[in-house]
Amino acid sequence: MASPKETLQRRAARVRRQVKAVANGRPRLSVHRSSKNIYVQVIDDVRGVTIAAASTLDGDLKGKLKTGADSAAAAAVGKLVAERAVKAGVSEVVFDRGAFIYHGRVKALAEAAREGGLSF
């Protein structure tokens, strides 16, 4: 039986393969979720640069959020990163959830990013 760490690594590798297969040169919307905060970046893997980034620790959001660890905070981060990406000229991305299950905060962030103008 696989340990929880091995399961996480396998899931991350599986998602990474899927993202790589469908990317076709599109930037990647990469999500990292911790117990207290959520972080997201729009990364251009071809050039190796971060186009836009946002997190619950951003000055724009930190004072407005009750906590960085709930779905409302994730939605605010999703909307903010979408706004920054559209401003930088990116409208189509590939969603990279990493090893995180598409549920709860990750799902709230994705839906808010779609509402903000990103398509994936």
Swiss-Prot record:
Keywords: Ribonucleoprotein, Ribosomal protein, RNA-binding, rRNA-binding. GO terms for cellular component: cytosolic large ribosomal subunit. It comes from the Bacteria. GO terms for biological process: translation. It holds the Pfam family Ribosomal_L18p. InterPro entries: Ribosomal_uL18_bac-type (IPR004389), Ribosomal_uL18_bac/euk (IPR005484). The keyword Ribonucleoprotein applies. GO terms for molecular function: 5S rRNA binding; structural constituent of ribosome. SUPFAM superfamilies: Translational machinery components. HAMAP family: Ribosomal_uL18_B. PANTHER family: 39S RIBOSOMAL PROTEIN L18, MITOCHONDRIAL, LARGE RIBOSOMAL SUBUNIT PROTEIN UL18M. Part of the 50S ribosomal subunit; part of the 5S rRNA/L5/L18/L25 subcomplex. Contacts the 5S and 23S rRNAs. This is one of the proteins that bind and probably mediate the attachment of the 5S RNA into the large ribosomal subunit, where it forms part of the central protuberance. Belongs to the universal ribosomal protein uL18 family. This is Large ribosomal subunit protein uL18. It comes from Brucella anthropi (strain ATCC 49188 / DSM 6882 / CCUG 24695 / JCM 21032 / LMG 3331 / NBRC 15819 / NCTC 12168 / Alc 37).
